[in-house]
């Protein structure tokens, strides 16, 4: 089996980012983004997706977190697209429900080659630890556009905003793990009747 690893660098006037991933990892993670709450959520992706993930970012945090969060989503999406390659033999679809105390979220993903995001999370607060929760929409939109996936995110219940967000990211990691897993029964075939994705 070919290694499913990728490293991507993105440099703009707003951010300088390096992302390295191993889709067949064990959940090892290292983050240096300057945004601690974002690091905490990236750790959920790594641990629950069993994806080795290394993210470094120097961003214009003196303005706010927006460019850093969005550009990390973009760069992570690019790394996924590069690491997964032609998608032959993958399960393609992934889904997960994850609870955390009173909160419950569902994430469904399709490595379809068609970017689309439906995110329905009725946050009960505007920020957590000074982090603007609206920025998670920017993160996921960047990821979706560059990984070329369809992603549905629903927080089904919850009143603690931290719990709402954490269940979303844990479910996202688990849905990714399912979708990118190689299916031996596919025998390297494309998971589409079209013959391509």
From Swiss-Prot:
* Pfam families the UniProt entry points to: IGPD
User: EC class of this enzyme?
Assistant: lyase
Specify whether Nucleotide-binding is a keyword of the entry. no
Protein's UniProt keywords contain Plastid: no
Any idea which UniProt keywords this protein has? Amino-acid biosynthesis, Cytoplasm, Histidine biosynthesis, Lyase
| Location in the cell | Cytoplasm
| Protein family membership | Belongs to the imidazoleglycerol-phosphate dehydratase family.
Reaction(s) catalysed (UniProt annotation): D-erythro-1-(imidazol-4-yl)glycerol 3-phosphate = 3-(imidazol-4-yl)-2-oxopropyl phosphate + H2O
Tell me where it mainly resides: cytoplasm
Q: State its Enzyme Commission number(s).
A: 4.2.1.19
Domain of life, source organism = Bacteria
* Gene Ontology cellular component terms for the protein in this record: cytoplasm
Q: Which GO terms describe its molecular function?
A: imidazoleglycerol-phosphate dehydratase activity
- Which biological process annotations from GO are given for this protein? L-histidine biosynthetic process
Annotated pathway, please?
Amino-acid biosynthesis; L-histidine biosynthesis; L-histidine from 5-phospho-alpha-D-ribose 1-diphosphate: step 6/9
Q: Can you say what this protein is called? A: Imidazoleglycerol-phosphate dehydratase
